[in-house]
From Swiss-Prot:
GO terms for molecular function: ATP binding; ATP hydrolysis activity; proton-transporting ATP synthase activity, rotational mechanism. It is an enzyme of class 7 (translocase). This is ATP synthase subunit beta, plastid. Its main location: plastid. It comes from Cuscuta sandwichiana (Kauna'oa). The gene is atpB. Pfam families: ATP-synt_ab, ATP-synt_ab_N, ATP-synt_VA_C. It is a peripheral membrane protein.
Length: 494
């Protein structure tokens, strides 16, 4: 833990720090006693000094004032080896992390310490992870679309530049792969700076993402300053305190690029549910009474303190894309339900589509966006999206009849609707760049104009004579024709 505070705070020498000692340890929670009149503030960072030089210091964050000159703090790392009576130093500031261009290409933990074995970070700029949201007068309310190159997203639930997007899905439906593809596409198309916050997810996925970024050139190990992303990890094997605060560490780094460098920044958080889950663990350890489904009573407040800082100002923007695990595929669970209120667009991943092998498994009817309005996206985009949704909705309504009576019992119009809906469903699948090594198919970036053209042609009946499998895992509509010709040639040679 760095004891030099950020530019927002006055520097005080170590001799003037308030000192206390541990009186109780309950797992990752410590009770610390201080002298009268020397109590630390809520959210201050405390450092437990190791008794020997080789012992690492443990950083904690003050969560409660207990009275009798005692505070309760949550540790950001393992508390193994700590004992009652050990000395604790109040740093006088919240946890402060390095910010600026020197963070690009590096991997950090919740304390802002590099964990990539590439040496210390060359910067004197530190910033506290607890800050207020920007005032209303500084906010930027302009509306513009953020093209991702993913057909189903750009057409039916477009993302807002400087907005917040949620990727909702249960276990194993493709949230992390979709986030990795978005990082890849956006870095290539826009060349902007990104910050990735790995909150309580698998260490293997964090390693895969790092390797993928090195291969694609998003991280340049020869010239780190030319890298486009900073990575902040608090994985699922870490204490709840680290998982609860790692999202704020990533956000603090993104805020610096927005406020000081005046850049447009992308903030990826995987997974926002783990942030809530860690808060629930900490809340129980602090002795608070749980609320609905066992979540912390402060769920809305904690979510708001993170989400309200993710916004666009007149200096720059933060566009946030957050994966949201949905427990038992229940969207009414308090964790995803609380997240919904803060989002501009929701991309819902469907297990039934994943079971059909349609990837990305984005549910075109459940996914929504406040940007899908004719005055924002234009009449052609809006009308095409509505016609696609109407066709898919009618197909969904007819599925029970098809399951019981079969396709032959439908009217000619309904049979045509079902055929076109199945082609659209498959056309909205897409090979991903980050999944090339698994699928063997090269990834495709499809412009919004091409997506609209393709769906318009399918709906108008231009491809009614082609089999639906030719629409599966292609990029533009022109590739469908090429695929159909290849299949005809194969059948002819047989």
């Amino acid at each position: 833990m760095r004891l030099t505070p950020n530019y927002d705070y006055e520097v005080s020498s170590i001799d003037k720090k308030k000192r206390g000692y541990i009186v109780q340890i309950i797992g990752p929670v410590l009770d610390v006693a201080f002298s009268p009149g020397m109590m630390p503030s809520i959210y201050n960072a405390l450092v437990v000094q190791g008794r020997h030089k080789q012992e690492p210091n443990v950083t904690c964050e003050v969560q409660q004032l207990l009275g009798n000159n005692r505070v309760r703090a949550v540790a950001m790392s393992d508390t193994d080896g700590l004992m009652r009576g050990m000395e604790v130093i109040d740093t006088g500031t919240p946890i402060s992390v390095p910010v600026g261009g020197s963070t690009l290409g590096r991997i950090f933990n919740v304390l802002g310490e590099p964990v990539d074995q590439l040496g210390p970070v060359e910067t004197n700029q530190l910033s506290p992870i607890h800050r207020s949201a920007p005032p209303f007068l500084k906010l930027d309310t302009r509306l513009s679309i953020f093209e991702t190159g993913i057909k189903v997203v750009d057409l039916l639930a477009p993302y807002r530049r400087g907005g917040k997007v949620g990727l909702f899905g249960g276990a194993g439906v493709g949230k992390t792969v979709l986030i990795m593809e978005l990082i890849n596409n956006i870095a290539k198309a826009y060349g902007g700076v990104s910050v990735f916050g790995g909150v309580g997810e698998r260490t293997r996925e964090g390693n895969d993402l790092y390797m993928e970024m090195k291969e694609s050139g998003v991280i340049n190990q020869q010239k780190l300053a030319e890298s486009k992303v900073a990575l902040v990890y608090g994985q699922m094997n870490e204490p709840p305190g680290a998982r609860m605060r790692v999202g704020l560490t990533a956000l603090t780094m993104a805020e610096y690029f927005r406020d000081v460098n005046r850049q447009d920044v992308l903030l990826f958080i995987d997974n926002i549910f783990r942030f809530v889950q860690a808060g629930s663990e900490v809340s129980a350890l602090l002795g608070r009474m749980p609320s609905a489904v066992g979540y912390q009573p402060t769920l809305s407040t904690e979510m708001g303190s993170l989400q309200e800082r993710i916004t666009s100002t007149k200096e720059g923007s933060i566009t946030s894309i957050q994966a949201v695990y949905v427990p038992a595929d229940d969207l009414t669970d308090p964790a995803p339900a609380t997240t919904f209120a803060h989002l501009d667009a929701t991309t819902v991943l469907s297990r039934s589509l994943a079971a059909k092998g349609i990837y990305p498994a984005v549910d075109p009817l459940d996914s929504t966006s406040m940007m899908l309005q004719p005055q924002i996206v234009g009449e052609q985009h809006y009308k095409t999206a509505q016609r696609v949704k109407q066709t898919l909705q009618r197909y969904k309504e007819l599925q029970d009849i098809i399951a019981i009576l079969g396709l032959d019992e439908l009217s000619d119009d309904d049979r045509l609707t079902v055929a076109r809906a199945r082609k659209i469903e498959r056309f909205l699948s897409q090979p991903f760049f980050v999944a090339e090594i698994f699928t063997g198919s090269p990834g495709k970036y499809v412009s919004l104009a091409e997506t609209i053209r393709g769906c318009t042609l399918i709906l108008s009946g231009e491809f009614d004579d082609l089999p639906e499998q030719t629409f599966y895992l292609v990029g533009t509509i022109d590739e469908v024709n090429a695929k159909a010709i290849l299949e005809e040639e194969k059948n002819f040679t047989k």
